[in-house]
Design a protein with these regions (language model features):
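Asparagine-centered strand-capping/turn motif at beta-strand->loop junctions
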Residues: 80-87
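Bacterial N-terminal signal peptides that target proteins for export
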Residues: 2-11
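Terminal connector regions
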Residues: 28-36, 128-175
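C-terminal motif of bacterial Sec signal peptides marking the signal peptidase cleavage site
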Residues: 20-23
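Intrinsically disordered, low-complexity Pro/Gly/Ser/Thr-rich segments with frequent PxxP/GP/PP motifs
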Residues: 99-136
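Short, hydrophobic/aromatic beta-strand segments
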Residues: 87-94, 105-106, 149-152
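Transition segment at domain starts
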Residues: 33-70, 159-175
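Short, solvent-exposed loop/turn segments enriched in Ser/Thr/Gly
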Residues: 70-77, 135
């Protein structure tokens, strides 16, 4: 009987250790992958074809209200997509502003070239609530007048717990 109790204790300890050890490991899908971009790079514009300069406003939400005092946090991904098959575009600046209009981050502060049909994304983590419910990105880009219009949008996501929220906002050209 004593041997059985000792064996049960050992098995219980092994099971508890296994339970806690596997519960504390990071999910492979949630690990951040290093970004290696060969399609988006700093560039001094050598071409004289640049005759189009645009500024795009993209509304985003670091949280959305579910009632007067309750809100859900949102992870934000800004996506800039060059939809032209042949021409590069240049991203001059990408800035992230709070509800109060305070500059929070400068994701791009000098000209970067984006290859044809390429995309680039910038992420604001789920727990970063500095932006608020009225946050926004300003994207300044340039290219040739014949360049296809890029698609610039943001995706907000929260899938924690038993609820999931996801929606997209489109960028609007400023005059």
């Amino acid at each position: 009987l004593k041997n059985r109790l000792n064996l049960l204790k050992i098995i219980s300890i092994i099971l508890l250790y296994t339970f806690f050890a596997t519960g504390c490991t990071e999910n492979e899908n949630n690990k951040k992958k290093p970004k290696e971009y060969t399609h988006f790079y700093p560039s001094e514009r050598i071409t004289s074809d640049i005759d189009r300069h645009e500024t795009v406003y993209v509304p985003v939400y670091s949280h959305v209200y579910t009632s007067d005092e309750k809100y859900e946090l949102m992870g934000i991904t800004l996506s800039v997509r060059n939809t032209d098959f042949k021409q590069n575009m240049w991203i001059k600046k990408i800035s992230y502003y709070s509800t109060q209009g305070e500059l929070l981050e400068s994701y791009v502060s000098k000209s970067h070239e984006l290859n044809p049909m390429a995309s680039i994304d910038f992420v604001v983590d789920l727990n970063d609530i500095r932006g608020g419910s009225g946050a926004n990105f300003i994207v300044e880009w340039e290219g040739s007048k014949t360049l296809s219009n890029p698609i610039i949008q943001a995706v907000m996501v929260n899938n924690s717990g038993n609820k999931a929220f996801s929606f997209i906002t489109n960028g609007e050209n400023l005059k």
